[in-house]
Amino acid sequence: MCIRDRIYSIMGPSGSGKSTLLNLISLIDRPTSGSINFNQSPIDFNKNDKNDIFRAKKIGIIYQQNNLLPDFTALENIYLASLSLHNDKNLAITKAKHLLKLVDLSNRAEHYPSQLSGGESQRVSIARAIINDPEVILADEPTGSLDMDTAKDVFQILKDLKSSSRLIIFATHNRFFANKADCLLEMINGSVKNINV
């Protein structure tokens, strides 16, 4: 269904199935029927450990309510996500510092989540989601709890991450951001009702 170098938005009211669809794509939830393919290969949901590693390598996830670790700094929150796959702490820290610069938060590296604004926390979440250079970025209402100006900044960062080797899928109930995607899927009652390219 999805082509790389594209941003896909999934739009629909609360309860329409947007988050459920993202949870299925991210392998957090198991489908009750049908299958999920990645690069034209089906995912085997009987191999949970293998899927956890696959998700960590291939999929970056950004949530509406950031789930940053409260007792760790912004820098630590980012590089710890890399250590789940690699044991090279120095390399992880170097990558995390680069990503903080990318999201314009170098001056917040040693700040804890409680010291960050909502927009800053979301930018840390984006940096953490991409530290393993995933092929797919899933964002569940990434701008939902932000004021409009901050939301536009966060959305621009997502647009800047689009590349020939990566696709971005985000769920939203905000028509303004949904219309800025390359492809819009509208959901109602758990089904895709309309696709606008």
Q: What spans do the regions from the language model cover?
A:
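Helix-to-loop junction immediately C-terminal to a conserved catalytic motif
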Residues: 26
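Conserved ABC transporter NBD signature motif
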Residues: 34-45
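ABC ATPase NBD coupling module
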Residues: 43-60, 163
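Short coil-to-helix segment of the ABC ATPase nucleotide-binding domain corresponding to the Q-loop/switch region
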Residues: 72-81
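Conserved ABC ATPase signature
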Residues: 112-122
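A short, proline-enriched helix->beta-strand linker immediately N-terminal to the Walker B motif
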Residues: 131-135
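Catalytic Walker B motif of ABC-type/P-loop ATPase nucleotide-binding domains
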Residues: 137-140
